[in-house]
Amino acid sequence: MFKFFWRCYFLSSNDLDKLTVNELKEIAKDLEIKGVYKYKKNELIEEIKKVSPMHIEKNGVVLREKIVPKSGKSKPEGINIEENSNRVESFQGDKIEDRRKEQDNNKQEENKREKLREMINESDTAKGVLEIIENNNYGFLRGKNYLTGPDDIYVSPSQIRRFNLQTGDEVEGKVRTPKEGEKFKALLYVQKVNGENPEKAVRRRPFENLTPIYPQERIKLENSSSDLSSRLMDIISPIGKGQRGIVVAPPKAGKTTLLKKIAQSISINHPDMKLIVLLIDERPEEVTDMQRSINGEVIYSTFDEEPEHHTKVAYMVLERAKRMVEQGQNVVILLDSLTRLARAYNLTINPTGRTLSGGLDPGALIMPKKFFGAARNIEEGGSLTILATALVETGSRMDDMIFEEFKGTGNMEVHLNRKLQERRIFPAIDIYRSGTRKENLLLSEKEYEASFNIRRLLYDENNTQNVTEQLINMLCKTKNNDEFVEVISKIDLSKEKNR
């Protein structure tokens, strides 16, 4: 400090001019001048003159105070006592002022928190399926059919990042009414994600990083003695959790009815599984019938909608299913139909410049294959089962091409036979062509032997219709599949036929 006073008392303007820039900066720092590095030499000199209390300029003459040694009686360093006390008082005053400001800020923050708590408590609770807008960070909670509507709820980018939210998440929370100039309600507070604690969504693994394995746990379809189609499928083409199945059917063979019965069986026998029925390009009356017949979620896009509508609905359903599987849930999607979904993509994609037989663009199969290929059993827990219908014998070369492309992608197939349907033999399941890969993982030893015997008989007889009719008659005479398997193991079907 003495160095500082010494410099200021004994340096005139000429003396300052003689100093280097670095020396001037040191003096400026002692005088507590801020931002000394941004000034040039002349500017530094001016700033030092402004704040230096050690000189008085009068008529252009600088009057400097000289330091004169005083007698011993005088107080040592008496000049600085009053100045130091003033500085202490000033410092204490500044400290008190800072403390007051801090308290005021804390009160304001507390008031804001209190207002936010009141707003959250008074707000309505709502939920919806999140759709994150592409090329943007924000999203909306969709309602009916996972599509845009007037009751959508805005979700901010900060909430999406905080809870690692993705398209397809079902978010539940408190919402506020739209402010002036806003169109949609806004999400204030996230309470649940996919029905669970939001913190669980933060730590989840992406669907693509989960390990797919063969289905090992069976989805039992049999629920009554009169439901013959479900009982026959349990023996001939069993379904496991994580199955990727395709129902191949000509028109009017009963594919929609078969899907409906499968949906009813799953909702009865496996109420813990999440069931979604996706109807693409279907008739409106079939949508109503399906909604009234099953206990599950029915998402639809009828044939009078645009192809873009079909593809958007399918995309949202797939993302919704993936998010549930990531949290360890077992999900079943029943799609009717895969053929019409591929047709919709054929109309909406950018043309690749190549065309397959029937006018099918190869690029139109990319998204339907992603949809169908998402079905898998997860080693870490959870599964996504997809059963999709494919149309054949429609007279359209495109439909045949679509089926051929998906023919080897599934691990379970059920073929419906038009000739059986014409003979009024229901269910019209072609036993010879239907089956499941690795069925031994799903069937018991007795059931596997019964299935093997039936197929061997079909090969020997080479008459699918007669053998199918015999099997259906035997199913009608037995109360359940256990009894049916016992009968199959004891009776030679070829002798039964000759009677």
Predicted features and spans:
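N-terminal "pre-motor" subdomain/linker immediately upstream of P-loop NTPase catalytic cores
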Residues: 95-203
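P-loop NTP-binding catalytic core
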Residues: 177-247, 253
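Short flexible coil/turn linkers enriched for glycine and charged/polar residues
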Residues: 122-124, 132-137, 147-149, 165-169, ...
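P-loop NTPase catalytic core
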Residues: 262-266, 272-499
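Charged, low-complexity terminal tails
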Residues: 1-121, 146
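RNA-contacting regions in translation and RNA-metabolism proteins
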Residues: 74, 102-104, 108, 113-114, ...
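Phosphate-interacting basic helix/loop segments used at nucleotide- and nucleic-acid interfaces
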Residues: 120-126, 228-232, 317-322, 371
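P-loop NTPase nucleotide-binding module
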Residues: 225-282, 318
